[in-house]
């Protein structure tokens, strides 16, 4: 089947479920596909997707766009179209498992004759999602719990694997205000950028090098870089090496301290006790002193692998003594002390 010069649009598509335990309505204004040539699609878009559950919550997505799609076989496209055409006549309970099975068939890793996982080319080149909203009560925009203006994933290559991801979103602090207070913050803006590149480590192991930045606006920025290793699909053998973390504090430590004890003088008195505890647990006085310096005057905290070639199993991150042996920690104090930052926080 070849419609390389055509754009095919289906919609609107509406699906509803009257099951008493989870009544649900969902709709997609339009699904468009263009540039189809058997196993390849140039572009697919879904416009104005909405799911309402029990008239109490809603998920809305302005647009989903996938480019340069490579399907598992030539028949997959026909099965997908058949399911879309029958969507209005199917219940959610029937439609969802069939759609999920088709997606998993396209996304699952292929294996060679030796049973090793392999792919001949990326499943898609780019996936972009715009204007995603999770709303507690449909129709009440002031109860928008989560809004993502932009999410994007670029699959740039297989030899080596290369991915780039980005996310810009904001979310309400309402769901956790009773457990965790952030004075002056009704919503938090989060930004994330990541670049993942396949490489071969010193021991000949296949690794993924991940670098990126995670930002909580007005709270903190985290720059990270590390090599990730895992051969087990369950990732129980997951390990990292050549770790680099740089935390730039813009108020996050003051918020955490406020939720432990809102009295600045109480937190100041707690610092010597914390320093003694850190020295004992980490087994490295220099690391403990760096953390205490950061907590006393939050500024920047840097963490590096002592030996960049040494793999650190994830389970060892739960062992303070192991962290003390494998990591080197340094700190640059901020301009204001923790009590001063807490007072400024409470003045908002």
What is the meaning of each model-derived region?
Residues 4-348:
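Glycine-rich, small/hydroxylated-residue low-complexity segments
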């Amino acid at each position: 089947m070849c419609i390389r010069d055509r754009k095919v649009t289906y919609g609107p598509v509406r699906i509803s479920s009257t099951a008493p335990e989870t009544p649900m309505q969902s709709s997609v204004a339009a699904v468009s596909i263009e540039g189809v040539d058997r196993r390849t699609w140039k572009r697919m878009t879904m416009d104005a997707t909405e799911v309402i559950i029990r008239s109490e919550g809603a998920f809305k997505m302005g647009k989903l766009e996938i480019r340069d799609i490579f399907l598992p076989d030539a028949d997959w496209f026909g099965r997908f179209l058949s399911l879309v055409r029958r969507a209005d006549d199917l219940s959610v309970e029937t439609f969802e498992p069939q759609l999920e099975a088709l997606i998993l068939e396209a996304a699952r890793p292929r294996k060679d004759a030796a049973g090793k996982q392999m792919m001949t080319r990326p499943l898609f080149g780019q996936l972009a999602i715009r204007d995603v909203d999770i709303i507690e009560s449909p129709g009440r925009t002031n109860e928008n719990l989560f809004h993502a203006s932009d999410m994007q994933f670029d699959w740039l290559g297989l030899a080596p694997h290369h991915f780039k991801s980005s996310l810009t979103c904001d979310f309400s602090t309402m769901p956790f205000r009773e457990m965790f207070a952030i004075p002056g913050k009704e919503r938090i803006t989060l930004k994330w950028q990541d670049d993942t590149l396949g490489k071969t480590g010193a021991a000949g192991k296949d690794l993924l090098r991940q670098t990126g930045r995670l930002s909580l606006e007005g709270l903190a920025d985290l720059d990270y870089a590390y090599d990730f290793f895992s051969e087990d699909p369950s990732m129980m053998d997951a390990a990292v090496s050549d770790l680099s973390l740089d935390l730039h504090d813009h108020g996050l430590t003051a918020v955490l301290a406020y939720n432990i004890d809102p009295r600045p003088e109480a937190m100041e008195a707690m610092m010597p006790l914390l320093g003694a505890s850190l020295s004992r647990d980490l087994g490295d006085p220099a690391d403990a002193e760096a953390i205490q310096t950061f907590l006393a005057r939050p500024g920047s905290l840097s963490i590096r692998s002592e030996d960049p070639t040494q793999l650190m199993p994830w389970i060892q991150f739960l062992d303070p003594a192991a962290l003390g042996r494998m990591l080197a920690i340094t700190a640059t104090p901020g301009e204001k002390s923790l009590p001063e930052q807490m007072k400024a926080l409470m003045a908002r």
